[in-house]
A protein has these predicted regions:
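Structured alpha-helical
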Residues: 1-138
Length: 138
């Protein structure tokens, strides 16, 4: 148990799972219903049913800043493309950026980005549940 959780300082209401899932991400235009940027690579770690920590080297994608150009009303969320854990192929989920930190030292990805999943459909929830289940037993 972590010190924050032991002292009652951890505000999370959902369990987090330590994973390392390579993903692609892009900024989405919710009004036009199309991508604003090309896809870039990242890795999801520390994932729960409502959010995750994304590791990436890209805080700026084609002129769009992941946090500064992040519309709180959900018009410009990130779209993450994840590998399917139940079948072949991939699936997408939308997320809002909550925070980010630049990580010092040698690491594949230089930024940690806090995400909250948004507008999760029933099929996305099933895929997310399957992903969490596959990593809770490993």
């Amino acid at each position: 148990m972590g010190l924050r959780k032991y002292l009652g300082l951890d505000r999370r209401s959902h369990s987090r799972y330590q994973v390392a899932v390579e993903v692609e991400l892009q900024i989405w235009d919710g009004v036009e219903q199309k991508p604003r940027t090309e896809k870039v690579r990242g890795r999801l770690i520390d994932i729960s049913p409502i959010g995750a920590c994304l590791q990436t080297n890209h805080m700026l994608i084609e002129g769009y800043h992941l946090l500064l150009d992040n519309d709180p009303s959900g018009q410009t969320p990130l779209v993450l493309t994840l590998p399917s854990s139940t079948s072949e192929g991939q699936w997408d989920i939308k997320a809002q950026v909550l925070w980010y930190n630049k990580v010092e030292g040698e690491r594949k990805y230089q930024f940690d980005v806090g995400l909250s999943f948004v507008d999760v459909s029933p099929s996305e929830r099933e895929n997310l549940h399957a992903l969490l289940k596959s990593h809770s037993s490993s």
